[in-house]
Amino acid sequence: MFSRPALTRGQPAGSSPPAQRGFAAVASPKASYEPATIAGVKVASRDDSGPTTRLAVVAKAGTRYEPLPGLTNTQKRSALRITREAELLGGQLTAYHTREALVLQANFLRDDLPYFTELLAEVLSQTRYTTHEYHEEVENVIHMKQAKLDASAIALDAAHAVAFHTGLGEPLYPTPSTPISSYLNEYSVAAFAEAAYTKANIAVIADGASEAGLSKWIEPFFKSVPAESASSISTTASKYHGGEQRIPKTGSNSVVIAFPGAALGANQPETSVLVGLLGGESTIKWSPGFSLLSNATAAAPRNFAYSDAGLLTVQISGKASAVRKVAEESVKALKGVAAGGVSQEVLVKAIAKAKFNLLSASEVSGTGLVHAGAKLIHGGQPLKVAETIKALEGVTAEQLQAAAKTLLEGKASVAAVGDLHVLPFAEDLGLKV
């Protein structure tokens, strides 16, 4: 039942001023990660005093340096015990890899920081790589991931391969035809883990924990992580090559058009704005969208930022005839930018989109954890959010025009997967490879 004051029964209509709608205040962006070194371990944290925490160990152990599996048994806990204890605490454990990093991440209630800090330290220093576990679990997981590879994933890997050859050109997951049994076993995995899991190669990133809280638990639990290893991770500087690769496949089609992009920490805000400008789909339900590719079928521009290189891609997936048409439109749109066809109105929208992409990637998907860790393990500093936003706001139409011209004048990396009778060659698109 409504209270009497809420009903205001009998009150004259004009006795109070009419309600007025106001604009909501602009929310401040989340604080940047603050770096520190605790007991020889590179750490970065930010604390919004919320009820939950995300804690991640980012190791320099991605496919660029050779792949390896994630969470498994440790000397103190079995995989089953780890799972059951995490469930009892309401936590979530995930392990995944990128081209440069292996990420062990835990999401949990704030008060459970001691348990999950100890658990992640155990995984680094006390994991047991058993023969039966490798053959019964790890091999099966690899085969399942190989079976799930679609044209989009294969095309993206192929574009990286022609762009960088080795290193960043290694696929995220090997294709079914890759002879992995000749190279991969429980001993090679254990040897790679020994080289990768050292204090010099890892960073601990926390979102929702204070530096003081981290220091209290990292110091005792991570002291068992070795400072260095007898063997080391092989690192070769990335070199962009460009080229073309075509792979026949039934059932699905995908084309990736790629160019040199912005590396992590590079002062190239125009690249992010160019991604926002190209867009690919409308983000508003009843609007056709402002982006140059908003009417395209499944066209997805993105800048893949790595420690010493970047790859700006436009990926198009769908029916072969539609993919060909949209690939042509994508290059046409980029040429339009190079010719100076960006209005002030569209530029403002593209900058706003770039700012949203930056902030949402950090807050929603957890990309900020990985990027902060990747920067630390490669000797850099975490992203400064306020400074980056200011740089995005300063991008001009002339900068976008110059960036687009530079891309088109250089060598592209083009990958086509699917019906090769229909899918275009780079030459058909007017691109140099």
Which sequence ranges carry the predicted segments?
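His/Glu-rich zincin catalytic helix
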Residues: 1-85, 190-291, 413-433
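Charge-rich, well-structured scaffold segments of protease-associated domains
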Residues: 2-17, 81-236, 294-433
